[in-house]
Amino acid sequence: MNKSEKRNVEIVLNAFDILFNKRDYATAERFWSPNYIQHSAHIPPGRDGLFDLVKGLPATLRYENHIAAATGDFVILHGRFSGIGLPAAWVVADIVRMEDGILAEHWDVIQDEATREQS
């Protein structure tokens, strides 16, 4: 990764930590574009849709990142959301397009975490 790509990864990881783990919505607004485009079938449109979804999730929600990479303006994450109020945690691949140092667009693939017996 070049310097710009590394910086984009740092920004996205920090943004995810602030929104999902710390639930600091005022600070998180600085990381997400007001014109944020959401392509997930699981998340309501826009920045407000994402923030409202998180506000409605249990306080036990946690995001753990396992893999982070970038190419150009795109950051790709593989991580785990736990404490979501469901029997299984979610394993998620997120793709974020950055624009002017903020999160501008998002795609994801979500699946229930398999147990050891299921793997």
Predicted regions and their residues:
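C-terminal and inter-domain tail/linker signature
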Residues: 1-119
